[in-house]
Amino acid sequence: MRNAPKVFLLVTIILLNCSKTNVVKLPITTTSPSALELYNKAMLSFDVGDGLEKRAALDSALALDPNFAMALEMYESPDPRLRIEHQERAKKMADKITEAERKMLKIRESYRNGDMDMALENARWLVDNHNDSFESYLWLGVVQSDRNELDNAITSLKQAIERNEDCYECNQILMGHHIAAGSQVMLPEDRRDVDLGMQYGDELIRIRNDHGAPFHLKANCYRQLGEFEKAKPLYEKSIEKRKGLSSEGTAYVVSGHNYMFGGDLTTARERYASAIKLVDDNPNSWFILNLYLTYSYIFDNDYIGAIDNISSVEIQLDERNFDEITLLLRKGQASWHKMICYAHNQMEDEAYSALGQRIKFNKKRAELLKDANVTREVKSDEQFQTAWVNILFGKYEDAKKNLEKLKKIQKQRNDPTAMYGYHGLAGMAHLMEGNHELALENFNNGNETAIYFNYFKGLALKAAGNDEDAKKIFNEIAKTNFSSWNIAIVRRLAKKQLGQA
């Protein structure tokens, strides 16, 4: 056994001079202490959205230890086949790593399987068995947040901060419950506290003053309040501190959002163009940042302009060096974006044609990947999207058939949020048929922070004679200053309901 490689098992304990608090991380197994340093560096990049830098550090770590399980799991290659290969290699190392690492791998696998009950069970194990580690409570808080169990999530994340006041991700998630940030799960409108969000933003700046991400998040607070001038210098600081990093384009995009909602659409689109140019050699980032340029046309009620931009992106996809699987994904997404625009612009034939293209590309992608999770998601998506388009064009009986199939698929998932989409669409269908009682019942069983469906919930409340609550919902939507396809569609409609458009 003399020639067997020495395995370094790290349980990091850092003594903080200011507070004398022992900060304990979860154990990570690797044959190389240098690989571990690179892994920790990668996770710092992960925290602030620098994906290329994260993968570069993990490449170096894996060169030193090719069987570094957590590095393989966290690599997250943009190539789906390589990503699956890394995940399978990490699983094969299960008998060489600690039980805590096995639980972390199982949490992430549970997300992929749509089994949020299993994710919760494994996160609770970490807390029960590594109660001294802030990371145990962070994992639990993330899972609880994604399950929309926000009170429990807040408690867990605060317990993580008690164990490590410099936990960047803890403060970021807590802030995101109050201030919009990407796909972060938020508290209901009446429980959001912008001042508290500001405090978390200040903590993020204290913890990572070296990077532009916390300045961007603090600026979001002012944007949420409609104080666009106060947000500008913070967005500029974010751009300055992200120069040369893979997230620099993101800094320009969010600055563009601030100009758009502040009424300067010309400067906003200039910022979007700058962002897109910065990532021209990164096909996935190029595709994603182009979406915000598309959304700017929808916000301006220019669906034809949005469709033109989508078409401009679409014709370039084959030349952008995507891998085979991701190319099909992006073609399906481009078709979906067209479908949304056509459907909400009452262009029926074009909407159904775009829907058909999305379904075709998704099925081909699933066939090539031969991954059970992707196959399930594609089947679910086909029923959801078809039901949605059928509802928008008044084909309610057809939509109900799609919804029954969707319900059957989603009920198989162990996830308290699995039926949110079903209830949102069912609520729309009942509303359009004039049954506001069943509509409200479904909306109330869905995601109470889903802005698109909340617009229709407002219409249902109005139909039921509850003008006060309807107006409250329309006001919440009308003052939302963040960019996504769903907000872009219903924000102007909500203003119209309030007599502001």
Residues covered by each model-derived region:
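Alpha-helical segment of the N-proximal tetratricopeptide repeat
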Residues: T31-S60, L64, R102-W125, N129-D132, ...
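TPR alpha-solenoid repeat register
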Residues: A71, S136, C170, P214, ...
